[in-house]
From Swiss-Prot:
It comes from Pseudomonas paraeruginosa (strain DSM 24068 / PA7) (Pseudomonas aeruginosa (strain PA7)). The active site is at 128 (n6-amp-lysine intermediate). One of its GO terms (cellular component) is cytosol. Its cofactor is Mg(2+); Mn(2+). NAD(+) binds at residues 35-39, 84-85, 126, 149, 186, 302, 326. The keyword DNA damage applies. Residues 711-794 form the BRCT domain. Belongs to the NAD-dependent DNA ligase family. LigA subfamily. The keyword Cell wall biogenesis/degradation does not apply. One of its GO terms (biological process) is DNA replication. Keywords: DNA damage, DNA repair, DNA replication, Ligase, Magnesium, Manganese, Metal-binding, NAD, Zinc. This is DNA ligase.
């Protein structure tokens, strides 16, 4: 076979493969390979066609933009094609682009020459959103048509759908817009919107999306615009097409005009001069990439002057005056070599993918999380599969999907082990207990657990590591490797054993000398008087994070009260739902856990909690009789019916004693509701449960007949604060504790409800948003003055 024949065969193969991927990406919205893999195949085809120009044909993917309109939508012919952009993957690619631009403008730039000399070129810079390109056509200021990019020449008519996107103006604002204006931009979904959409899908048993781009594309191409309207889509303009009238003479000027007409543009739009400034912008956006509210995969640079754009013109499928500088790929293909099972501190047996090493976002990845066996089943994963791996920021690499067309014939199914790979104890699937409408039911959970508890060294090590961590007991110097030594040598079999360690035992550990031994023993001693919140967090209760631990401590005031709180009582606390309430209750009801806590609180060797003592004032008499009845989940007794029963009988005892005739006399209480209540109360277990809950509400002072307490107002009560940037006098965690002690809620994001933002050096998008919203902003000195004002030490 000659070189030309081999090239022709490979070219045909690449064209077929690229066309298949284009169809899956643009028409089915089910991409089967990462963008980086597609780009590699595309560049290989480009190179082969450049070497063998006689093999170039008009139908090659390199000669047109990808995709075919779906037949269910009407077709729209783009009078000016919607072309894709050339890509830069390395810094040299960007420098080459700038050189070509300056060469093309040699006659127009001061001091220009054919070698690309002369003045630097102005470029517009903006993030490259990862969404779906669309065209919006305005006539006399009215939105008359929306269309997808399609194949660049022909798209789909999605007018009814784009009209549902809340930030797309149906009528342009202001004045001065052209009679006919085609706006081009990206429809996308923010990270928060994507997470909320998937969470809702999980709740309703619907289909979840793999990423925001797929979610945006799938939402925009719904035949029923009501579905599109229910999705959190957004639009951002980046350019224009057909125009009848005049526009500003620069790219940035046009986008700023769009903003004035109510058309959203990127807040990150910048004007720079020269290739180095472009590179600086690229680096800056790259550093802040994970802090942005939306997914991006690079930045776009465009020659700013429209006259220069026209001078430079176009190539077959892309403009010569623009380029997309891509970030290192966050998705790659690799092979699943095997699956190992790890055991965590709660006994959860978690599958971990062992992968053929591959570079993802500049890091070699050989392992990836699989979360649980339900996720393995959802992916349809088998050993030997080719899989898509994603890595974003500091997030643990994930297996996103299987490339089914590359599955080998000998691919093996993945099975959970029957026995713990560490201790050999049985592995059991968790059972979820649910109470609803007076009934208790069991269902299978997603987690498999080793039943060995602290006799399992994997669980013991992870439990100790969590117990001593900075946000828990904060035992300085007791790192993971030291914990492993303590457990492996049999010196620690429970968190309580830390407090009985002797000098000789610690001194004999690898890496310890006299000073380090004394320091560790001193750190352990210093941890004997933790706050109640730290101790609760240190216990490692499932689903109880640092914030929930603080809430429990602040609300109920003592470990004894928290330990015996019934799930129904716990749900009176804000942000504690039924599932978390049952996790807390079940943890303290467990005999093994009670023994561990008793050992930790041993009078001679254990910890002495700094307890607040009382139930917080805001929870005194917080329960109402109507709310209590509603929480019993009696079939057909909703909030309105509960209020009627409370009003009629005035007490739980009165409701329990009510006969059928009494219930039928409750005004507007439906017969089926009365019958349901009577059936519920005829079950002795239900009555006993209700009386037990009421008794505990009385004991805790939360009962509707309890005395209300005066709430002493904290100075920042009801205010939401946000911390951003670096603080020097204290860590952000410490600053957060100080503000919470003054009554503030410290949030992770800025919104119109934010009262104040504390911004240290390096503050980025949060500070920018605060300034945009006109919020109060303090620097670190301002924060310290505030703490001094209220007598808070720092």
């Amino acid at each position: 076979m000659t070189d030309t024949q081999a090239a022709a065969e490979r070219i045909a193969q690449l064209r077929t493969e690229l066309d298949t991927h284009n169809y899956r990406y643009y028409v089915l919205d089910e991409p089967s390979i990462p963008d980086a893999e597609y780009d590699r195949l595309f560049r290989e085809l480009q190179a082969l066609e450049a070497e063998h120009p006689q093999l170039l044909t008009p139908d090659s993917p390199t000669q047109r933009v990808s995709g075919t309109p779906a037949s269910a939508f009407g077709e729209v012919r783009h009078e000016i094609p919607m072309l894709s952009l050339g890509n830069a993957f390395e810094e040299q690619d960007l420098l080459d682009f700038d050189r070509r631009v300056r060469e093309g403008l040699a006659d127009l730039l001061p001091g220009g020459d054919l070698l690309g000399g002369g003045a630097e070129v102005e470029y517009s810079c903006e993030p490259k959103l990862d969404g779906l390109a669309v065209s919006l056509l305005y006539e006399n200021g009215q939105l008359v048509r929306g269309a997808t990019r399609g194949d660049g020449s022909t798209g789909e008519d999605i007018t009814s759908n784009v009209r549902t996107i809340r930030n797309v103006p149906l009528k342009l604002h202001g004045e001065g817009w052209p009679d006919i204006l085609e706006v081009r931009g990206e429809v996308f979904m923010s990270r928060a919107g994507f997470e909320a959409l998937n969470a809702k899908a999980v709740e309703t048993g619907g289909k979840t999306f793999a990423n925001p781009r797929n979610a945006a594309a799938g939402s925009l191409r719904q035949l029923d615009s009501k579905i599109t309207a229910s999705r959190p889509l957004e639009f951002c303009a980046y350019g224009f097409g057909r125009v009848s009238g005049t526009l500003p003479d620069t790219q940035v000027g046009i986008l700023e005009a769009f903003r004035g007409w109510g058309i959203p543009i990127s807040r990150e739009l910048r004007l720079v001069k020269g290739a180095q400034a472009c590179r600086d912008y690229y680096d800056d956006i790259g550093r802040r990439r994970d802090a942005l509210a939306y997914e991006i995969d690079g930045v776009v640079f465009k020659v700013n002057r429209i006259a220069f754009q026209r001078e430079l013109g176009f190539r077959a499928r892309e403009p010569r005056w623009a380029i997309a500088h891509k970030f290192p790929a966050r998705e790659e293909l690799t092979e699943l070599l095997g699956v190992e099972f790890q055991v965590g501190r709660t006994g959860a047996v978690t599958p971990v993918a062992r992968l053929k090493p591959v570079q993802v976002a500049g890091v070699t990845v050989s392992n990836a999380t699989l979360h649980n066996m339900d996720e393995v089943a959802r992916l349809g994963l088998r050993i030997g599969d080719t899989v898509v791996i994603r890595r974003a920021g500091d997030v643990i690499p994930q297996v996103m999907q299987v490339v089914l067309e590359r599955r080998p014939a000998d691919a093996q199914p993945i099975e959970v082990p029957e026995h713990c790979p560490v201790c050999g104890s049985a592995v059991e699937r968790t059972q979820l207990v649910r109470r609803s409408k007076g009934r208790e039911s069991l269902s299978e959970g997603a987690i498999y657990r080793c039943v060995g508890r602290l006799s399992c060294q994997a669980q013991l090590k992870q439990a100790i590591i969590h117990f001593v961590s900075r946000r828990a007991m904060d035992i300085d110097g007791l790192g993971d490797k030291i914990v492993e030594q303590l457990v492996d040598r049999g010196l620690v079999a429970s968190p309580a054993d830390l407090y009985t360690l002797t000098y000789d035992q610690v001194f004999e550990l690898e890496g310890f000398a006299e000073l380090s031994t004394n320091n560790l023993l001193a750190a352990i001693a210093d941890s004997r008087t933790p706050s109640l919140a730290r101790f609760i967090f240190a216990l490692g209760i499932p689903d109880v994070g640092e914030e929930t631990a603080k809430l429990l401590a602040r609300s109920l005031g003592s470990l004894e009260r928290i330990g015996k709180a019934l799930p129904e009582v716990l749900t009176y606390l804000p942000d504690v739902g039924a599932e978390v309430a049952y996790e807390i209750h079940n943890f303290f009801a467990d005999e093994h856990n009670r023994q561990v806590i008793a050992q930790l609180r041993d009078a001679e060797h254990g910890v002495q909690l700094q307890e607040e003592g009382e139930v917080a004032a805001e929870f005194a008499a917080c329960a109402s009789l109507a709310g209590f009845i509603d929480k019993l989940n009696i079939p057909f007794i909703a909030a309105t019916g509960a209020e009627k029963l409370a009003s009629r009988f005035g007490s739980l005892d009165g409701i329990i004693r009510a006969d059928w005739l009494d219930l039928r006399q409750v005004e507007r209480l439906p017969e089926r509701a009365a019958k349901s209540l009577r059936d519920f109360l005829d079950e002795p277990a239900n009555v006993q449960r209700a009386l037990a809950i009421e008794a505990q509400l009385r004991e805790f002072g939360m009962h509707w007949q309890s005395e209300r307490k005066a709430v002493e107002g904290l100075p920042l009560a009801g205010q939401t604060w946000v911390l951003t940037g670096t603080l020097e006098a204290m860590s952000r965690d410490v600053a957060k504790e100080k503000l919470e002690g003054l009554g503030a809620k410290v949030a992770g994001s800025v919104s119109a409800r934010t009262h104040c933002v504390v911004a240290g050096p390096g503050a980025g998008s949060k500070l920018a948003k605060a300034n945009e919203l006109g919020l109060k902003v303090l620097d670190e000195d301002g924060l310290l003055k505030l703490l001094d004002e209220y007598g808070v030490a720092h």
